[in-house]
Amino acid sequence: MQRPLTEAEAADAMRVIMRGEATAAQIAAFALAVTVRGASADNLAGMARAAQEFATPVPRAGGDLLDTCGTGGDGLNTFNISTAAAIVAAACGVRVAKHGNRSASSACGSADVLEELGVRIDLGAEEAAACLDRTGITFLFAPVFHPAFRHTAGPRRELGARTVFNLLGPLCNPSGARLRTLGVPSRELVEPMTEVLERLGVTRALVFHSADGMDELSTAAPAHLVELRDGRRTTHRFDPAEHGLARSRPGDLAGGDRAVNAAVLRRVLAGGRGPARDVVLLNAAAALRVAGVAGTWSDGLRLAASAVDGGAAAGLLDRWAHASWQRADLVEVPA
């Protein structure tokens, strides 16, 4: 590759891959070339736009949907912070379409922990839309909505290393959600990932990387953060300690397997105190700011805490788990 690919060229290459017309060797070579050169906003936007052409859309979704996610790859093996934050945000009235998969770089991905919590993860498009209508939150399992990505599975497995493909998942929410919180594994990715989200039609977003390496807003360290709001981008140094949150220590936010992480989420949603609660409230506050529900970080933290302490978040998780197993043609979730 003598020069960086343009957005159109990256999109064309991705279409060849998604159609199953590229060999495993070609897919691996392409992924490595883009990754080694450094995935640019042009590369990522082109690849994500092309991948979305092959996705199964979510009916009746609407553009006011929120997704909360991290790209993974920070190597810290924390519990599922963005998943917990999504539940709290939904309990505050934000419509959430959580796009995710099983674990790629830790012991437990969003799909794994939700499955452990009783949520059915493999809903089809109509079922996912019905669940969203009933509860205000739904899960979009990447293999169901992006079947064409199966062509990349073999080469990615053989490479055994993170590549540009690992950055695409958070960019390719099949609901068209225009509200995003997105954590990335390096500071250098914050600006390009924000630019890509804007090119893909996202109207409001917070994209961040914490100084301790976390692809979430961490309570252990400040974060480099870019806010996208209706076409304007502003850069901040965000320190949670300035908003009254205690500094967490290494290990305070550690996760484990799906059973361990599910227990952490249930404990937080039940009102348990400590570092896990603080980091969930922080990331939920970010989601509430993006959604326009909270005008300030303090408001976001207060609303998130109220949803947890008043039982709304735990109650929503129970309703979500129940609704996810109902037929799409049922008008209401049976009592």
From Swiss-Prot:
It catalyses: N-(5-phospho-beta-D-ribosyl)anthranilate + diphosphate = 5-phospho-alpha-D-ribose 1-diphosphate + anthranilate. It is an enzyme of class 2 (transferase). GO terms for cellular component: cytosol. Mg(2+) 2 binds at residues 215-216. GO terms for biological process: L-tryptophan biosynthetic process. It holds the Pfam family Glycos_trans_3N. 5-phospho-alpha-D-ribose 1-diphosphate binds at residues 70, 73-74, 78, 80-83, 98-106, 110. Its cofactor is Mg(2+). GO terms for molecular function: anthranilate phosphoribosyltransferase activity; magnesium ion binding. Mg(2+) 1 binds at residues 82, 216. Binds 2 magnesium ions per monomer. Its EC number is 2.4.2.18. Anthranilate 2 binds at residue 156. Keywords: Amino-acid biosynthesis, Aromatic amino acid biosynthesis, Glycosyltransferase, Magnesium, Metal-binding, Transferase, Tryptophan biosynthesis. Gene3D superfamilies: Nucleoside phosphorylase/phosphoribosyltransferase catalytic domain (3.40.1030.10), Transferase, Pyrimidine Nucleoside Phosphorylase, Chain C (1.20.970.10). The keyword Glycosyltransferase applies. Pathway: Amino-acid biosynthesis; L-tryptophan biosynthesis; L-tryptophan from chorismate: step 2/5. It comes from the Bacteria. Anthranilate 1 binds at residues 70, 101. NCBIfam families: trpD. Belongs to the anthranilate phosphoribosyltransferase family. Catalyzes the transfer of the phosphoribosyl group of 5-phosphorylribose-1-pyrophosphate (PRPP) to anthranilate to yield N-(5'-phosphoribosyl)-anthranilate (PRA). PANTHER family: ANTHRANILATE PHOSPHORIBOSYLTRANSFERASE. This is Anthranilate phosphoribosyltransferase 2. It comes from Streptomyces coelicolor (strain ATCC BAA-471 / A3(2) / M145). The gene is trpD2.
